[in-house]
Amino acid sequence: MCSGWSSSVIWRHTQFAVERCGFCGSSGPGAPLEPSTLGSKHLPWEAVSAGFADRNRNMDGAMWLSLCPDNEDLLWRKKHKLLQARGKGDLALQRRADAKLWKNYQLQRLAEELRRGYQEAQHLHVGGLDRLQSARLLGWGGGRARENEPDSQGPIQRRSARPPRAKEKHRAALSEERSCREELGQQHPRHSRPRKTAASPEKPQTTKATGRMNSHLAPPEKRKGRPEPSTKSGGGRCAIHPRRSKGADLERSNPLVAAVGEIGLVEEKEKGTARAGRRQLGKGAVCFVPALTSRSQGQSLEGKLRDLGQLWPADSSCRREAVSPASQCTLREKNKWQKELELAFEELFNINRKLKKHLCLYLALKPRMDQRPGEGHAFSEMQECGAGTPRGKKMADPEMLPAGEPRSPAEEEAQQAASKTDLKTFMGKAQNQKYQGTVKPTFRNGSQTLSPEAGIFINKEDSLLYSTESGQETPKLGTLAEGSLQLHLQDQADRVGSTASRQRQKAEMEQRRQKQLESLEQMEHPDMSLEIHYKAELEKERREQRRARLAHLKSSSTRAQERERGSELSTTSPSGTSLADDDRHSQMIRDQQQQILQQNRLHKQFLEEARKCLREFQNIC
């Protein structure tokens, strides 16, 4: 009981002392320390002993605090120091965060300044180039070109790199201008204006006009501070002395005018130094470039710079990246080969067109023969009689009688009827205009061309001779009639054979023309090759030429035999004229074929040359 009572008393005393001193324990002010707070693992006596030890410690601290006179002030000071320490730590953290933010802000600000400076430099660069181009086009009052191309980056770099030299130049220029003004004022105090008007009365008007023109066409940035007179003496500009004397008088009267004049002169001095530096870089390059002011207003900075780079000449000092001579040679060779190839293809197409026109004209000159059914029947009868083609002649040769033997009256009547029908058909052909244009046989005995009247007269004479021959009994008249009839029939047979051979040749030629027209139509197609197309045609033409030559040789041999037989009968025979006509016609056909073959060969040669050029061009590329 005593121990429990003593422990409770001690507990109360310690709690009262702690509350009185304001000491904050582990459980906070006003919160009593219970045995449960010590932990559930301790036994009751262990908890009591631990609590007792803590209480003794608190009592000792309270006794020590109570002994000090200013214990509350000390506690408050300690608390204040602790709070200050905590605040200082927070401030350090805040300072660190603020330093990071400040650095980021400074970096952003620097980046913005750099971006702004780059944009301004680009604007100034483009504006300076525009002004220089406009000044070059206008000639700056004299209509003359500058001696060299402006280097746009030169003055900017000089101004940015060497500012003290620029200041010294300004000071030197100002001092020179002042000394010049003083000298001019001493030399020409009053008589400057009348001397100027007397010396050159027309010069001020021209200078005024040029000054106005330049001021109107110049950009607005330079229009404000630009003075009318020019300081340069060379390059087609007027003298300085009269204007300077006038300006000196004005400057004496008005100090503002003097200040403006000094600024303008300084600017012109800067321009002169910049121009002198640019002239040293490259001399002798005179070039006019179209102005970019109107074009560059609605474009971005990159577009303006690209346009200026494209329009700038190759020999200027700005364009340092020169093309190598090997690449220039290859480009020239490529352009040369390309031009030659284009010319070759143009010539090829022109030759194709000419060949087609030539063939069309050749085909139009020989139209088709309109064969009638009566004519075909008459030709069949003539072939049956044995005087048409060489085959008919071969079949009729064994049936023909010798020249000296007499013939039967039935055979003579049949031959006479056949000759009459042949004459009628022949006269019908002569009446046809197309046939008259192509075939015009002549007779040697009468030396007259064939006409309807002549044909009728011959027919009547033959009929009269035949009628008198049947009535006569004397052998002389019979032999004469037989000889004349035989000659006439032979002539008619030769004519009919020649006409049949001509018609056959014409039919063959028409077939060839049709094939050639088809080939020409196929030639116009780009994928068809001309060699493959012409090989078959050339082979066919060669075969046909061989056949025609063989047939001509056979017909000439048969005609030679007939001529020999006819010469035995009579010295005069009209078969020679028909043979001459056949020879002429065949010769014309051969000439035309030779021309076509020659044109084909030339065309092939041209194609081979064009292919070679194309291969060389492809190898070069």
Curated annotation (Swiss-Prot):
Residues 142-253, 385-421, 491-529, 543-586 are annotated as: Disordered. Residues 171-185, 219-229, 505-529 have a biased composition (Basic and acidic residues). Residues 159-170 have a biased composition (Basic residues). Its main location: other. One of its GO terms (cellular component) is centrosome. Residues 203-213, 568-578 have a biased composition (Polar residues). Residues 328-359, 498-525 form a coiled coil. GO terms for biological process: regulation of centriole replication. It is found in: Cell projection, Cilium. The keyword NADP does not apply. Keywords: Cell projection, Cilium, Coiled coil. The keyword Coiled coil applies. PANTHER family: ALMS1-RELATED (PTHR21553), CEP295 N-TERMINAL-LIKE PROTEIN (PTHR21553:SF33). This is CEP295 N-terminal-like protein. It comes from Homo sapiens.
